[in-house]
Amino acid sequence: MGLENLKPAKGSVKKIKRVGRGQGSGMGKTATRGGKGQTARTGYKAKRGFEGGQQPLQRRLPKIGFRTKDSHIYSINVEKNGAIKDLEEITFSSLRALHHFPLYIEGVKLIGKDAKNLASKIKDERIKTSGQK
């Protein structure tokens, strides 16, 4: 067996598709593009997300989610949460440990009758009490 007898394995080499080279090839005339229409023309490219007239996926699914650009202030009622009164220092991280509020919260407002009494314990500028601006 010499180099001249070597052949690739059966089915490993595909036949090259030469389109528009006569009707005898089976891919002549319309060159496998079908007759007329937008897809038969040169330069045709479907839009991203186009599904052939079917309602596209991004339009079938509902619109979800919105986050306002306004500042996010989280209100905590002091009367309902006695744990805040027991804190020696009120900081943003200590309140986060007590109340599992979302990460995007930028400030906390303490509300209720006893909130003004806690103003001296507050050690963080992101925390305000009711009546305070």
UniProtKB/Swiss-Prot annotation:
One of its GO terms (molecular function) is rRNA binding. SUPFAM superfamilies: Ribosomal proteins L15p and L18e. InterPro entries: Ribosomal_uL15, Ribosomal_uL15/eL18_sf, Ribosomal_uL15_bac-type. Keywords: Ribonucleoprotein, Ribosomal protein, RNA-binding, rRNA-binding. Transmembrane segments: none annotated. The keyword Transport does not apply. It comes from the Bacteria. GO terms for cellular component: cytosolic large ribosomal subunit. The keyword Ribosomal protein applies. GO terms for biological process: translation. Residues 1-64 are annotated as: Disordered. Binds to the 23S rRNA. Part of the 50S ribosomal subunit. Belongs to the universal ribosomal protein uL15 family. This is Large ribosomal subunit protein uL15. It comes from Helicobacter pylori (strain Shi470). The gene is rplO.
